[in-house]
A protein has these predicted regions:
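Conserved SF1/SF2 helicase motif Ia
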Residues: 67-90, 177-178
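Conserved interdomain linker/interface between the two RecA-like ATPase lobes of SF2 helicase motors
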Residues: 172, 186-284, 332
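Conserved helix/coil segment N-terminal to the catalytic DExD/H
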Residues: 111-148, 344-348
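Conserved pre-motif I regulatory segment
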Residues: 2-50
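Conserved C-terminal RecA-like helicase domain
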Residues: 80, 96-107, 275-352, 357, ...
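SF2 helicase catalytic motif II
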Residues: 131-134, 140-179, 183
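Conserved segment of the helicase C-terminal RecA-like domain
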Residues: 374, 381-383, 389-430
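C-terminal helical accessory/scaffold domains
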Residues: 494-496, 502-503, 507, 513-517, ...
Length: 836
């Protein structure tokens, strides 16, 4: 492809956008796959772009957005969907650079902050996660007004059982509501990309081009054998490198790989299967690297010591201490157990080449743009569902694709560590699977019961689908409907409709007089055969059904064994969501979670009325931890042993529990989750929680955040439950009060006496306890402090004059705001008041 075809000046883009790309981002020519995709995008067509990591997919999407907003549909809006919050922040930064130059407002939607709401309402381009967009379409359907283009990044995560169904429903709903909107999907290479493009009516652009050539190799013990090269037109490397043997211990191939790449000025990413492995590997590599730097680059140790000291000062756990120690040797680990501040420090240090190596779990490959010259996938198996399984090819390719930094590295090196058996034979098998083998097809995960009941209720409650025919039509527009037989799809829908009706989340408002059969694919001889004893029909499906979530019964619990045991819903059936169903959909929780919460809360009310067993904050936290929406902490093998501290805790709180569960691994995980939350709101130090339960600060924060959200959901569900008599409503109110108190304590991590103080900006639970020990109980007490007490407070460690003045100013602002609100309330006429 010649240069004129790749020149920005030939795209017809606004002059100021071309100027921005050339002057700010240094882009004058498009990469070949970008140039191949841009004509389709510029013309406004739906486009699916499947090219390797770091090949410039995002720029194509940005061009499409600017073209729609400033050329094709002036005054319209764009939505950029990402699967992860970390990726949202990255895209937000890039789009804000564009927006500042072109006078376009960029908004972010990843949580519930009030500032986000204002951004969402006012922005021209909204960057959001799939879950946030789904929630917005339920609560604020006007978010789609004026939208002319939608970008779905990391589209291959449609294959993910957790995130995939929401992405699939979002795309189906957007196509249903906005059939004329342009859809741009960005994906890694997948096996059935053409079928996916057909589903979305998109032009498919596939390329293997990379900005930096990528050499794939297997590493068996210390023997490195290059297997394939994915070339770039910019590369001077034409052939595979020769096999060679690395220097170093056979027992530590990661060190051999690191010392080898570091000697040539490169960095290393090591992917391992678990958090524990990431920390252990980083610790070993850091110790070796620290000795190496002491001999060869002692100046580097000074810079690393500064970073280590910074991490140590902010550390509140053994894991944080370990991270700070690893960093002394230029190595760090990266996983979901880290706090956000720790991840940010580590990522920036690696980007700035202060760190030479990161050990990480596979989540890094999907979420953060941190390329390195060399990638080593140390672990190709993962422990899953009680057994060790090989990783999918797609996932490994994502990791390997992080090798090679554009503009910095002459080539990327993607290495696969081969373990066990005959090294040569294992290496050949690994190469055949992960280097030369095909990538798996993407399959819809929407048929799984959690996904189907969640999105089916949403479609009825907030999606405007009120009859069986329209429901079927909508779900036929999903990838599940595109790739599966009609009868399989309709049976999944109908079984879940029956469950939602049974649980009173929806009701039938106009039951059809005559059931219509969906079994139009069943031959006539089946009717006669099925009446014979012992004869049933097995339906062949194009993909394997998704297993029920471990630890839960299937919500439908239908026990379907043959054709006669299932009754389909009539096509003319009408449905509407109940008050409970509407609220559950708005709360964005699984209907099964709502059902579990409702059952437990009803038991709690009966206990309060009868004054039998206790209902405590622990009771409520344990109930929440039993729902599928809560990510339970899993007990370690030692914690499952009889006589363990966790077993003892389970026995002590048995009378407080609101749900019945067997004493198994999952049940102990629920107790552990509630106990972790209890330790948090009883003001235990994060180090103490880590010592007691082995839970890192990042996990404490993520679980307590989830707990707070689900306690709010429990409150709303209880308020909409209509089974109790009027004489018992006072007891319901008592339980609502306990839910509110528990949620406030969980969110603040403190005892009840500090709840007023932690409302003050800049006052967390530790500072609130310091104030309490000085006799300060309320924000008003702060305003009454004498100069002597103020000076005493300013002198305390971690406080200081500036902080104290800010806190006092914050309290004053709260007091003024409350006075203004009181006056406004006093001026508001009462209902029925005459206004002459």
């Amino acid at each position: 492809m010649g240069e004129p075809d790749r020149a920005l000046s030939n795209l017809g883009l606004p002059e100021n956008f071309q100027t921005f790309l050339q002057q700010e981002w240094g882009i004058k020519l498009l990469h070949p796959p970008q140039a191949k995709a841009v004509p389709s995008v510029i013309s406004g067509k739906n486009t699916m772009l499947c090219i390797p990591t770091a090949s410039g997919k995002s720029l194509v999407a940005y061009i499409g957005i600017v073209n729609q907003l400033l050329n094709l549909n002036k005054g319209s809006r764009a939505i950029y969907i990402v699967p992860l919050k970390a990726l949202a922040s990255e895209k937000l930064g890039e789009l804000r650079q564009i927006g500042d130059y072109l006078n376009l407002k960029i908004g972010l939607g990843i949580g519930d902050a009030p500032s986000e709401t204002r951004q969402i309402d006012d922005c021209d381009i909204l960057v959001c996660t799939s879950e946030k967009l789904d929630s917005l379409m339920r609560s604020k359907p006007e978010v789609l007004s004026r939208v002319s283009v939608v970008v779905a990044d990391e589209f291959h995560l449609l294959n993910d059982s957790q995130r995939g169904p929401t992405m699939e429903i979002n795309l189906a709903r957007i196509r249903h509501i906005l059939p004329d909107a342009q859809l741009i999907t960005l994906s890694a290479t997948v096996g059935n990309s053409q079928d996916l493009a057909d589903w979305l009516n998109s032009e498919l652009i596939i390329s293997k081009w990379r900005p930096v050539s990528l050499e794939y190799a297997t590493l068996a013990e210390l023997d490195l054998e290059p297997r394939a090269i994915q070339k770039s037109e910019l590369s001077t490397t034409e052939n595979l490198g020769p096999p060679r043997t690395l220097e170093g211990p056979k027992s530590h191939v990661a060190w051999a790989a690191l010392s080898d790449v570091y000697s040539n000025g490169g960095q290393l990413l090591v992917f391992v299967s678990s958090r524990r492995s990431a920390q252990a590997e980083a610790k070993k590599l850091g110790q070796r690297m620290q000795k190496h730097l002491a001999k060869n680059n002692p100046e580097m140790l000074d810079s690393l010591k500064e970073l280590s000291n910074k991490l140590s000062r902010n550390s509140n756990s053994v894991m944080g201490d370990t991270l700070a120690e690893c960093v002394k040797g230029g190595v760090a680990f990266h996983h979901a157990g880290l706090m956000h501040s720790q991840r940010t420090e580590i990522e920036n240090a690696f980007k700035n080449r202060l760190l030479c190596c990161l050990t990480a779990t596979p989540t890094l490959a999907a979420g953060v743009n941190l390329p390195a010259r060399r990638v080593l996938v140390r672990d190709l198996k993962r422990y899953d569902d009680g057994m060790s399984r090989l990783l999918p090819v797609m996932e490994v390719r994502q990791m390997l694709g992080r090798a090679g930094r554009p503009r910095y590295d002459p080539i990327g090196e993607a290495w696969l560590a081969c373990k066990g058996g005959d090294p040569r034979q294992v290496a050949d098998e690994i190469a055949d699977r992960y280097i030369h083998g095909p990538v798996e097809d993407i399959t819809s995960k929407l048929a799984a019961e959690p996904a189907m009941r969640f999105h089916l209720l949403s479609s009825i409650a907030t999606g405007g689908l009120t009859n069986r025919r329209s429901i079927g039509d909508f779900f036929r527009g999903t990838y599940l409907g595109h790739s599966q037989t009609n009868s399989y799809l309709q049976e999944n829908i109908d079984s879940m409709l029956k469950w939602l009706v049974e649980k009173r989340f929806i009701r039938r408002t106009n039951v059809g007089e005559q059931e219509e059969s969906w079994n139009d694919e069943i031959p006539s001889w089946v009717s006669a055969a099925q009446s014979a004893s012992g004869v049933s029909m097995v339906k062949k499906k194009s993909t394997e059904p998704v297993e029920a979530t471990f630890g839960f019964k299937k919500a439908s619990s239908m026990g379907v064994t043959g054709l006669n045991s299932f009754e389909y819903e009539a096509l003319d059936n009408e449905y509407e969501a109940t008050s409970m169903g509407h609220r559950v959909s708005q709360l964005y929780i699984d209907p099964l979670s709502a059902d579990i919460l409702l059952e437990g809360l009803r038991r709690a009310v009966r206990r309060i009325v009868r004054k039998t067993l206790p209902v405590t904050s622990f009771s409520l936290c344990h109930l929440v931890s039993s729902t599928p929406d809560f990510i339970s902490l899993w007990p370690k093998s030692k914690e499952l042993e009889f006589g363990s501290r966790l077993r003892q805790k389970g026995a002590l709180v048995e009378d407080e529990l609101l749900i019945e569960s067997p004493i198994d691994e999952r049940a102990m995980g629920m107790v552990k989750s509630a106990w972790c939350t209890e330790l948090w709101y009883e003001e235990k130090d994060l180090r103490d929680i880590e010592k007691e339960l082995g839970v890192t600060p990042g996990d404490v924060y993520s679980r307590t955040d989830l707990m707070g959200w689900l306690l709010l959901a429990a409150r709303e569900i209880l308020l909409r439950d209509d089974i109790f008599a009027d004489e018992h409503l006072g007891y319901v109110s008592e339980l609502v009060g306990l839910l509110d108190l528990t949620r406030s304590r969980v969110r603040a991590g403190c005892k009840e006496d500090l709840l007023q103080l932690v409302q003050v900006r800049g006052v967390g639970r530790n500072r609130a306890r310091t104030l309490s020990e000085m006799g300060i109980r309320t924000p008003a007490d702060l305003l009454a402090l004498s100069n002597f007490d103020l000076d005493k407070l300013k002198s305390k460690r971690g406080w200081g004059p500036i902080l104290v003045e800010r806190i006092i100013d914050s309290v004053r602002n709260i007091a003024v705001g409350q006075q203004d609100k009181t006056r406004r309330d006093d001026d508001e006429p009462l209902p029925g008041e005459r206004q002459d």
